[in-house]
């Protein structure tokens, strides 16, 4: 395709006010739901009308993870539909569209900016948590998992079927499968096997017309888009068919801390030089965080090194002694265990914790903010020290995670799926802060922006890349009721790089009126050569 492209926008500014739809009416919406569902699968009990009652607030808060958005906007939120059947999802899509009501789709509630459960225009929430069935086929090494299941539930089901099968996904067990996979979720198996979207072979999706589609009926372009491009811009993900991977019976993990006083900065600098060049069986995360110092009232930074190796401890020790002796890894630091038990380790549960804990769905929201970056070359020691200096300014919990690339991630083309961040990245950074009281929100958000600014010289640029699953409204957004294409390109190129153009084309083909939208959704644009 030539560099000079003429871009025909289906709508340079697509807004609710411009669409020829009826004025939002909750009563009409509810009646539509009842009309479009059968008595065999009644929807009435799945509907919670928005009101200031304990019952409704409990429904809203049960999957609201960020307390910054724990107070629903009753002037805009009309209802929550906790779908229990596919027909409930279909009816919700059709009835919301017919009545001019915006739809927000919530799986596990871990959307970091709360875009799956808030809007500034009249909307309904489609909760997916009841749709959580999982079927594992050991012979084919495949599984079907519904969007409302959590990673913890998926890992338990896999473990019940096999001791040597796994799925390369994240380490937080309460994350919902629907959004995690569609945004390109990653975990400690990524250097060996890639990320979630590299292991999806089929999907079920409800489109803008309420039709149930699979890979064959949706077509390869839409199937490509929902693997890494975020499913909520294109439809409602019902389920994923995933390919499981073979892992050894014995894996080894360790957790070693190095404070600044123990040479943590030097070890982290060396980590940057070797982490992407380790054998692909080894994943080693670096996690700088503020901790209490040796003296009362003192604070320091500890770089916590978490690692997982697909093999026994002796082989891991040999690698570490050769590649990163500065860490000083000892045999007693290493713990051999099954893949399933590593999921408990990474979730920070103590040894011996029953696996049933991964089935829990705790409702303990907190105040937090996260941002992300991709790093292409080592951050110099003076750069690390500037980051430490900024972290010390925080009065609340703050940390960064450095997640190494390399291995298989260097071998998968950036266009294989909609997830583009592949070869050329040394590691991905997540910045996070949490706080206890609402009155600390403003200063906490301001400090995160300062930390992000300090990191700017040391990370990717033009664009400054970002990870879609670490949603960050600061990098660009649209109002709830419109999608300005120029604004969408700002955040879109950061999340999707060169894949954005194809994503916009797919959006224009399957959702030309832009029904499935939020503040950071894909706009419908046809690109004509």
UniProtKB/Swiss-Prot annotation:
This is Berberine bridge enzyme-like 7. The keyword Nucleotide-binding applies. It is an enzyme of class 1 (oxidoreductase). One of its GO terms (cellular component) is extracellular region. It comes from Arabidopsis thaliana (Mouse-ear cress). The FAD cofactor is bound via a bicovalent 6-S-cysteinyl, 8alpha-N1-histidyl FAD linkage. Residues 1-19 form the signal peptide. InterPro entries: BBE, FAD-bd_PCMH, FAD-bd_PCMH-like_sf, FAD-bd_PCMH_sub1, FAD-bd_PCMH_sub2, Oxid_FAD_bind_N. Disruption phenotype: No effect on the levels of ICN metabolites. Binds 1 FAD per subunit in a bicovalent manner. Probable flavin-dependent oxidoreductase. Glycans are attached at residues 52, 257, 341, 439. Keywords: Cell wall, Disulfide bond, FAD, Flavoprotein, Glycoprotein, Nucleotide-binding, Oxidoreductase, Secreted, Signal. Its cofactor is FAD. PROSITE patterns: FAD_PCMH. Belongs to the oxygen-dependent FAD-linked oxidoreductase family. Disulfide bonds join 32-95. Residues 69-247 form the FAD-binding PCMH-type domain. Its main location: secreted. It is found in: Secreted, Cell wall. Its EC number is 1.1.1.-, 1.-.-.-. Pfam families: BBE, FAD_binding_4. There is a cross-link at residues 110-172 (6-(S-cysteinyl)-8alpha-(pros-histidyl)-FAD (His-Cys)). One of its GO terms (molecular function) is FAD binding.
């Amino acid at each position: 395709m030539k560099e000079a492209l003429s871009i025909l926008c289906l709508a340079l500014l697509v807004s609710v006010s411009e669409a020829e739809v009826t004025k939002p009416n909750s009563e009409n919406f509810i009646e539509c739901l009842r009309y479009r569902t059968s008595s065999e699968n009644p929807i009435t009990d799945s509907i919670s009308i928005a009101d200031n009652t304990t019952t409704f607030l409990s429904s809203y808060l049960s999957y609201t993870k960020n307390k910054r958005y724990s107070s629903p906007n009753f002037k805009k939120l009309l209802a929550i539909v906790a779908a229990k059947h596919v027909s409930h999802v279909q009816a919700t899509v059709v009835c919301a569209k017919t009545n001019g009501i915006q739809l927000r789709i919530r799986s596990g509630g871990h959307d970091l900016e709360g875009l799956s459960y808030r809007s500034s225009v009249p909307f309904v929430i489609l909760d997916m948590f009841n749709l959580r069935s999982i079927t594992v086929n050991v012979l084919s090494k495949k599984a079907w998992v519904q969007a409302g299941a959590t990673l913890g539930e998926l890992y338990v089901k896999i473990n019940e079927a096999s001791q040597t099968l796994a799925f390369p996904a994240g380490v937080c067990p309460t994350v919902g499968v629907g959004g995690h996979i569609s945004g390109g979720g990653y975990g400690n198996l990524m250097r060996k096997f890639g990320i979630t979207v590299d292991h999806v072979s089929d999907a079920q999706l409800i489109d803008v017309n309420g039709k149930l589609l699979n890979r064959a009926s949706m077509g390869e372009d839409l199937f490509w888009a929902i693997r890494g491009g975020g499913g909520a811009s294109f439809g409602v993900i019902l389920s994923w068919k995933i390919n499981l991977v073979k892992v050894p019976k014995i894996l080894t993990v360790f957790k070693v801390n190095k404070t600044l006083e123990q040479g943590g900065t030097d070890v982290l600098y060396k980590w940057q030089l070797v982490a992407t060049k380790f054998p692909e069986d080894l994943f080693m995360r670096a996690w700088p965080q503020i901790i209490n110092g040796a003296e009362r009232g003192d604070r320091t930074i500890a770089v916590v090194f978490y690692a997982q190796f697909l093999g026994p401890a002796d082989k891991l020790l040999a690698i570490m002694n050769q590649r990163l002796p500065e860490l000083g890894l000892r045999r007693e630091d290493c713990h051999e265990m099954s893949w399933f038990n590593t999921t408990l380790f990474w979730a920070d549960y103590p040894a011996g914790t029953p696996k049933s804990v991964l089935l829990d769905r705790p409702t303990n929201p907190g105040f937090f903010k996260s941002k992300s970056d991709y790093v292409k070359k080592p951050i110099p020691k003076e750069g690390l020290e500037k980051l430490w200096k900024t972290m010390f300014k925080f009065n609340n919990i703050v940390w960064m995670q450095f997640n190494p690339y390399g291995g298989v991630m260097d071998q998968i083309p950036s266009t294989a799926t909609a997830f583009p961040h592949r070869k050329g990245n040394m590691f991905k950074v997540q910045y996070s802060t949490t706080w206890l009281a609402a009155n600390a929100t403003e200063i906490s958000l301001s400090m995160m922006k300062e930390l992000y600014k300090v990191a700017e010289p040391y990370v990717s640029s033009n664009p400054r890349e970002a990870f879609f699953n670490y949603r960050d409204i600061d990098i660009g957004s649209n109002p709830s009721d419109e999608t300005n294409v120029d604004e969408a390109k700002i955040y879109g190129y950061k999340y999707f790089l060169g894949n954005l153009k194809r994503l916009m084309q797919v959006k224009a083909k399957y959702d030309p009126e832009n029904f499935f939208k939020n503040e950071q959704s894909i706009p419908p644009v046809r690109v004509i050569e």
